[in-house]
């Protein structure tokens, strides 16, 4: 009976399998995206599907909700994006683009999956009316203050002119 002395021994194969077993969990962990990475990927998808002329970039990310540990479960997200100066046709990352002055702001909500292999998201974005409403409230308050001030000035002028008119004694 002949033994194989020159071939790989059982000990070497065991060592190789052990190392593979240690490396595989690291590869699986590397495939799970962080909450912010998943949102940035979703924004890339939004930019690809958008018919707008310029790219959008993350302006504000709402706090991460409490989540379970399963990367395959859809996670709720909400964030705000703003139009940049970079055209959609550019090869630049949106993060390398400056925000456009008076650029369009959109509020986005939906879900993302943190498993990088699935790379799935369901996001819808609409014009952020909260900012427009705040601006409208500002102008309404200015109008009220100016209007109230003008009424007071008008009343003082009326009182002053009323005192100038000579009074007749009867």
From Swiss-Prot:
GO terms for cellular component: extracellular space; vesicle. Proteolytically cleaved by proteinase PRTN3 into antibacterial peptide LL-37. Proteolytically cleaved by cathepsin CTSG and neutrophil elastase ELANE. GO terms for biological process: antimicrobial humoral immune response mediated by antimicrobial peptide; defense response to Gram-negative bacterium; defense response to Gram-positive bacterium; innate immune response; neutrophil activation. Gene3D superfamilies: 3.10.450.10. Residues 150-162 are annotated as: Active core. Disulfide bonds join 86-97, 108-125. Transmembrane segments: none annotated. The keyword Transmembrane does not apply. It is found in: Secreted; Vesicle. GO terms for molecular function: lipopolysaccharide binding. Antimicrobial protein that is an integral component of the innate immune system. Binds to bacterial lipopolysaccharides (LPS). Acts via neutrophil N-formyl peptide receptors to enhance the release of CXCL2. Postsecretory processing generates multiple cathelicidin antimicrobial peptides with various lengths which act as a topical antimicrobial defense in sweat on skin. The unprocessed precursor form, cathelicidin antimicrobial peptide, inhibits the growth of Gram-negative E.coli and E.aerogenes with efficiencies comparable to that of the mature peptide LL-37 (in vitro). Belongs to the cathelicidin family. This is Cathelicidin antimicrobial peptide. It comes from Macaca mulatta (Rhesus macaque).
């Amino acid at each position: 009976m002949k033994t194989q002395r020159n071939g790989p021994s059982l000990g070497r194969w065991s060592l190789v399998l052990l190392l593979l077993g240690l490396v595989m969990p690291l590869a699986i962990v590397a495939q799970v995206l962080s909450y912010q990475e998943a949102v940035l990927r979703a924004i890339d998808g939004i930019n690809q599907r958008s018919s707008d002329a310029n790219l959008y970039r993350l302006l504000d990310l709402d706090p991460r909700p409490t989540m379970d540990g399963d990367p395959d479960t859809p996670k709720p997200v909400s964030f705000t994006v703003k139009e940049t100066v970079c055209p959609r046709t550019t090869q630049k990352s949106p993060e390398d683009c400056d925000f456009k002055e008076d650029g369009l702001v959109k509020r986005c909500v939906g879900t993302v999956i943190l498993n990088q292999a699935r790379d799935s998201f369901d996001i819808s974005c609409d014009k952020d009316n909260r900012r427009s409403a705040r601006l409208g409230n500002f102008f309404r308050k200015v109008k009220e203050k100016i209007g109230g001030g003008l009424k007071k000035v008008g009343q003082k002028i009326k009182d002053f002119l009323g005192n100038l008119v000579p009074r007749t004694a009867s």
